[in-house]
Each structure stands twice: as structure tokens, then as C-alpha cells.
């Protein structure tokens, strides 16, 4: 078993060095890592093939194997991701506020690195380079714990990244990957408060719940998305159909996909058959309440669990409401704080929805699929936070920083 105390100590030492690494040197390191991923693609793909073969032996679902699979094109995308991080503005050292107090003290608030970030994730090997790149640009060391399914791929990628950093004259312990993927080691990692400043879980609901329940280190939850679209009585039907189709079917396995429809009862008879036809053509299965099934009896009966479920599949739940108040109450009861949308022509209802829905991103007449760091102008993202502290919504570089007050005086003493 790996000595986590040694790993933590190395990470903390690396973080100290990274905290004052200039932007040009960080960018040099990132470009070296991007180049190395391409140069060493043969060995990375060979390692990935071992993971694919093991997954097939274990009869893993094809959709999950696809998430695990690396190709020449996907490696190029990973390298491009690191190059894009180079182009992002370095947040470290940014002065957020500056004030001269009546006593002559000049007080500045500056952006600084968090320190050491731990990331626990599942089967996507691209997270190894993506997470490293973002943490590194923000001046943080990172300790990675990937899933057992991708262990060969992750080890190969981490080895390449560490060698590239070392050749550039940067502490290779800026990125460390745990070789032991056991739950026991993961649980110990979650209690490494002395060395790790924050943990970020990336994966399904089970992983996130486990980290939140077991960690003694502060956790930023990157969330599951039980996202709703509310079709108000003044909704433009064509707009609603296009938005719902996009939000549900464009990409099933993402946290910003729509999982539940909430429909005003005054448009139920006209709108529900249209959306049913549109989505069933794409093999979507509906699970609906009694009022909706009275209009479309072909729909399956929805349970309480359905309304609380992030399907990530060709399934959608339907709830009929009497108006905006009931819609907001239903959504706030079942949502996961991710992304919620209203389709309406009523300005007052739109504003009420924006004010009263409790979520990281709230939309009027747009698809929930836009909740994404790149779309929001943040560049790459480490994840989408569904909590309110320390970050909320798509987390770019700034979310991987903290602040420090810097005070200049000329001999002041407190009276």
C-alpha cells in the first residue's frame, strides 16, 4: 500500500513551489505535457488497451467502455485541452480589491492558489490530464485517485506528465496518481487534512455521496443533475419542443441533460401529445403522473423515485402542475441544484422562476445543456458545483483559487 503521508508531504512541498511559479514557466510546463502526450501516445494507447480488455472480460456496458476508450484523436483532444489552458489568463496574483483606509493602511485582496487539491474520479482517463492542467495553471498541486477500470491508462498518462514537468525543471510532484485504487486507500485519502486542502469528486451520485459522507477534508461537490424544464401556459410550443428535444436527447450521459418535464395543466391536452411524439421517435420512454397519463395512456406510471432520479438514459418523467407556484415548489423539492429552465412568454413568470428556483444555473427559453465552463466563457472546467460554498456552477480556474489580504503600512499600530 502506498504511503499517503509521503504523497501528501510531496504534494505540499510542490504546492509551495508552484505558488510563486511565474505564468511563462507554468505555460512552458503545460505545453511540454501536451507535446509529451502525443510523443508517447503509443505507450498510452497500449496501456489503455489493457483496461479495455479487462472491461470487456468484466462485461462492462458498451457505453461505459466508450468512456474508458482512448484513441489517437482523443489523445490529441487531451493535448489540445492543455494548450487551451495555456491561453487562459493566469488568475494568480490578480488584485480583486484595493483600498486605503483612514489610518493610511493600504489593503489589497489578491487571488492565490488553494494549495493541494485531491480529485477522486471514475472511468474517464482524460480527467487525469484535464484535472492536472487546470490545477497546475491555478498554482495548485494535485493528488489524483482514478477508478480501477482505468488504472493502466491513468498510470501511463501520469507518468508522461510527470516526466515532461521534470524535463522542464518543474517539480514533478505537482501531479501524483495513487496506484492503489482500493476503497480503503480512498477513504484514507479523504482524511488527509494535514496535506490536502480540498477534495473534488467527479463521477456518479454514488461516488459523490461516498466522498461527502467520509471526507474530513472540505469537499466541493460536482453534481448530479436532475434537471427540469417547465412548460408554462404561455410557452411557444415549437420553441419548447426544440429545447426539450435538445436537452433530453443530444447527449444522454451528461449532468446538464433534462430528466423531467413540468407542464402547466392549461396546455397539457395540446402540448403533451406533441412532445410525446417528438421524443418517442428517438426512443425516449415517458414516466408520467396520473393527469399526464389521462392524456397519453401509453406512458408508464411515474413513482416518487422517478421524480428524484437522474436517469442519464432514454427516460423522462412528467409532472402536471396548476401554475408557476406549484412548478417552482415541485422543482425545488426534487432538483439537485444544477440547471433548471422555464419556457414562457410571460415576463413576470420568467422573473419569478429566476428568483425562486434554487439552482446553480437558471434559464429562460433555453436548453439546460448550456451549463458548461467553455460555453459560459470560463474556458476549461474542473466540474460543475451544485453546492453554494466555495464555488457554484461551472468551475474554471478562478474556482481553484483562494484569496489573501495584503496590507501595506508605514508604522501604524492599533490604538
UniProtKB/Swiss-Prot annotation:
Q: Which GO terms describe its cellular component?
A: cytoplasm
Q: In which pathway does it act?
A: Amino-acid biosynthesis; L-proline biosynthesis; L-glutamate 5-semialdehyde from L-glutamate: step 2/2
Top-level enzyme category: oxidoreductase
Q: Which UniProt keywords apply?
A: Amino-acid biosynthesis, Cytoplasm, NADP, Oxidoreductase, Proline biosynthesis
Molecular function GO labels: glutamate-5-semialdehyde dehydrogenase activity; NADP binding
Entry keyword RNA-binding: no
This protein's record includes keyword Transferase? no
* The EC number(s) this enzyme carries: 1.2.1.41
**Biological process according to GO:** L-proline biosynthetic process
Q: What Pfam families does UniProt report for this protein, alphabetically?
A: Aldedh
Report the subcellular localization.
Answer: Cytoplasm
Annotated CDD domains: ALDH_F18-19_ProA-GPR (cd07079)
List the catalytic activities from the record.
Answer: L-glutamate 5-semialdehyde + phosphate + NADP(+) = L-glutamyl 5-phosphate + NADPH + H(+)
Its main subcellular localisation, reduced to a broad class, is: cytoplasm
Tree of life domain: Bacteria
The role this protein plays is: Catalyzes the NADPH-dependent reduction of L-glutamate 5-phosphate into L-glutamate 5-semialdehyde and phosphate. The product spontaneously undergoes cyclization to form 1-pyrroline-5-carboxylate.
What family is this protein classified in?
A: Belongs to the gamma-glutamyl phosphate reductase family.
- The molecule here is called Gamma-glutamyl phosphate reductase
Amino acid at each position: 500500500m502506498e504511503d499517503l503521508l509521503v504523497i501528501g508531504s510531496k504534494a505540499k512541498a510542490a504546492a509551495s513551489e508552484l505558488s510563486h511559479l511565474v505564468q511563462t514557466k507554468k505555460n512552458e510546463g503545460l505545453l511540454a505535457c501536451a507535446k509529451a502526450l502525443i510523443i508517447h501516445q503509443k505507450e498510452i494507447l497500449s496501456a489503455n488497451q489493457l483496461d479495455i480488455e479487462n472491461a470487456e472480460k468484466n462485461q462492462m456496458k458498451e457505453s461505459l467502455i466508450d468512456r474508458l476508450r482512448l484513441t489517437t484523436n482523443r489523445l490529441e483532444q487531451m493535448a489540445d485541452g492543455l494548450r487551451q489552458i495555456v491561453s487562459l489568463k493566469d488568475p494568480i496574483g490578480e488584485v480583486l480589491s484595493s483600498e486605503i483606509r483612514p489610518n493610511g493602511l493600504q489593503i489589497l485582496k489578491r487571488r492565490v492558489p488553494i494549495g493541494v487539491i485531491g480529485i477522486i474520479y471514475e472511468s474517464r482517463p482524460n480527467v487525469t490530464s484535464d484535472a492536472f492542467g487546470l490545477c497546475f495553471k491555478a498554482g495548485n498541486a494535485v493528488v489524483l485517485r482514478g477508478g480501477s477500470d482505468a488504472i493502466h491508462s491513468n498510470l501511463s498518462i501520469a507518468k508522461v506528465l510527470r516526466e515532461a514537468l521534470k524535463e522542464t525543471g518543474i517539480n514533478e510532484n505537482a501531479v501524483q496518481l495513487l496506484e492503489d485504487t482500493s476503497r480503503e486507500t480512498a477513504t484514507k485519502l479523504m482524511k488527509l487534512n494535514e496535506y490536502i486542502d480540498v477534495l473534488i469528486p467527479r463521477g456518479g451520485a454514488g461516488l459523490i455521496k461516498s466522498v461527502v459522507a467520509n471526507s474530513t477534508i472540505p469537499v466541493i461537490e460536482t453534481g448530479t443533475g436532475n434537471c427540469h424544464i417547465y412548460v408554462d401556459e404561455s410557452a411557444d410550443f415549437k420553441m419548447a419542443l426544440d429545447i426539450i428535444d435538445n436537452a433530453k436527447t443530444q447527449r444522454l450521459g451528461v449532468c446538464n441533460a433534462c430528466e423531467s418535464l413540468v407542464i402547466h395543466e392549461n396546455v397539457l391536452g395540446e402540448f403533451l401529445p406533441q412532445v410525446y411524439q417528438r421524443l418517442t421517435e428517438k426512443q425516449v420512454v415517458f414516466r408520467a403522473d396520473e393527469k399526464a397519463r389521462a392524456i397519453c395512456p401509453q406512458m408508464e406510471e411515474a413513482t416518487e423515485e422517478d421524480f428524484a432520479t437522474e436517469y442519464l438514459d432514454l427516460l423522462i418523467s412528467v409532472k402536471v402542475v396548476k401554475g408557476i407556484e406549484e412548478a417552482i415548489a415541485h422543482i425545488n423539492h426534487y432538483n439537485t441544484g444544477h440547471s433548471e429552465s422555464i419556457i414562457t412568454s410571460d415576463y413576470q413568470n420568467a422573473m419569478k422562476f429566476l428568483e425562486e428556483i434554487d439552482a446553480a444555473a437558471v434559464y429562460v427559453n433555453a436548453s439546460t445543456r448550456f451549463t458548461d465552463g467553455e460555453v459560459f466563457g470560463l474556458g476549461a472546467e474542473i466540474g460543475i458545483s451544485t453546492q453554494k460554498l466555495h464555488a457554484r456552477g461551472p468551475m474554471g480556474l478562478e474556482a481553484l483559487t483562494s484569496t489573501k489580504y495584503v496590507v501595506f503600512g508605514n508604522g501604524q499600530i492599533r490604538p
